[in-house]
């Protein structure tokens, strides 16, 4: 019998290689299969992040935002949650030019993930969007 723990890892590794090769449809198929076959698997946030990155590479901002929001909503305690939140805020700010939507996302990152690698940049952007005098 196959080791059911190793199989999702193998499938994810194959999808990651395909994504690195810019073979997005094939990678997406493997990732979708992983989510369908093993719902709730610990790799699910990595799968969603990979799907978001591929969507961004194809300029599909709407799909990327859905994937990132799903990570923030369902995997808020996982290692990629702060990355997803920062990317989501960045998309609102820089792709959609929607500072009003980006501001609370940066604030959420600062309060929920104060130790994040993104905290310094999120604080800088939050203050700039809020209109604070940053020349002090």
Feature locations, PLM:
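Acidic, polar-rich low-complexity tracts and alpha-helical solenoid repeat scaffolds
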Residues: 1-136
